[in-house]
A protein has these predicted regions:
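Residues within membrane-spanning alpha-helices of integral membrane proteins
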Residues: 3, 35, 41, 68-72, ...
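Alpha-helical transmembrane segments in multi-pass integral membrane proteins
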Residues: 4-28, 46-58, 84, 104-106, ...
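Extended basic-aromatic, gly/pro-enriched interface segments that bind polyanionic ligands
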Residues: 30, 36
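Specific transmembrane helices
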Residues: 43, 47, 65-91, 259, ...
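Residue-level signature of the transmembrane alpha-helical core
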Residues: 68, 72, 76, 126, ...
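Hydrophobic alpha-helical segments with transmembrane-like composition
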Residues: 82, 99-158, 178-182, 196
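Short hydrophobic, aromatic-rich alpha-helical segments embedded in or entering the lipid bilayer
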Residues: 90-99, 293, 298
Length: 353
């Protein structure tokens, strides 16, 4: 769901949907579904984590094979086929391959600007075991308090002088570093701890009534996106926000994320997420996300549509279909065969024997 929503906001931008219109304001903030992805990632990883040395080896092994093969495959193909990436310096290539491009000024390569979020996600993978180790002897209730405190502190990230003064010459945009988005991860971390509290109290299978009306929470989520897309709330489009505007943007994303994520985490009623096609989309969502920008960059010239000149209703379904097909290929040819070290070894043996 998050991958499709992020694709939609990119299509809306590239086809010139007016961000000052009501629908444009909402579509422009569909990037808040990234917050849902961050929260879901934190929720799944935190609740399944056992913080001892043996588990850490398994944890990092799984994270590497889950993320890196598909990412490297996309970067290599994009470097070879996306014109905007031609002539990239070795520094840019190596930083992109190592998830460190956000730490370089002008570090983004054409067709790969969306990968910044994976740089943030990789830092979370590194930070999470440290956080778990520090809180290993603390109960769920106190962990929730810690996460709430850290989330509040993270809202001050953009106000730090060194961050507020970026980006500038030879300095990257530090607003998009991991601390700036901890609130979004905190939603998932807190949800995991609340789940543990419910398990200990024997009410794990009892739905949380406040979340039974999911449609109402969706309305709040859409209102949060609409509000964040208004000029009085902060700049629209690619204009760099001030520290206060960035903090407001993160808060709105946190509200939207909680409204979308929590009703499904704490109320197990049937939903559209149970449909087979949605389950399959979830399976290929990583490759779908990786490749959708390249697909969009191909669809526009094939249709003879110049950027920012319209065609949203034509470009959107074609970009979805193309991303679905390429994402499926990425999953079948890269993600699944290279899902673990053992699987990768067997795959390479089949290829080169």
């Amino acid at each position: 769901m998050s991958a499709v929503a992020i694709m939609t906001t990119h299509v809306a931008f590239q086809t010139g949907i007016d961000p000052h219109s009501h629908i444009g304001a909402i579509l422009g903030r569909f990037d808040y579904f990234l917050a849902v992805f961050f929260a879901f990632s934190a929720y799944l990883l935190w609740r399944g984590m056992d913080f001892h040395r043996g588990m850490l080896v398994t944890y990092f092994h799984r994270r590497f094979w889950r993320v890196v093969p598909g990412y490297w495959a996309y970067v290599v193909v994009a470097l070879a086929l996306v014109p905007e990436a031609f002539g990239a310096s070795w520094v840019s290539v190596l930083s992109t391959l190592s998830f460190t491009q956000i730490y370089l000024p002008e570090g983004f390569l054409g067709g790969m600007t969306h990968l910044w979020s994976l740089c943030v996600e990789v830092v979370f993978y590194l930070v999470m075991p440290l956080l778990g180790w520090a809180l290993r002897n603390v109960g769920p209730a106190k962990r929730i308090m810690v996460f709430c405190g850290l989330a509040l502190l993270s809202l001050g990230w953009a106000f730090l002088p060194v961050v507020a003064d970026s980006p500038r010459e030879h300095v990257p945009n530090m607003q998009i570093f991991f601390p700036g988005f901890f609130c979004w991860y905190a939603v998932g971390l807190i949800a995991a701890e609340v789940e543990e509290l419910r398990r200990r109290r024997g009410v794990m299978d009892k739905p949380v009534k406040v979340f039974q009306y999911r449609w109402a929470w969706w309305l709040v989520a859409f209102f949060a996106m609409w509000l964040a897309g208004q000029e009085f709330f902060g700049p629209v489009g690619l204009e760099h926000p001030s520290a206060g505007e960035f903090a407001l943007r993160v808060i709105a994303g946190t509200v939207m994320c909680a409204c979308v994520f929590l009703p499904y985490a704490f109320h197990s009623a049937p939903s559209f997420l149970d449909w087979r096609i949605i389950s399959y989309l979830g399976r290929i969502s990583y490759s779908f996300f990786l490749w959708h920008l390249a697909v969009l960059g191909t669809v526009l010239p094939l249709l003879g549509i110049r950027p920012f000149t319209g065609g949203f209703l034509v470009v959107l379904p074609l970009t979805f279909i193309g991303s679905f097909i390429v994402g499926s290929c990425g999953y079948v040819l890269v993600e699944w065969p290279f899902r673990s070290a053992r699987a990768a070894k067997l795959t390479l043996l089949r290829i080169f024997r």
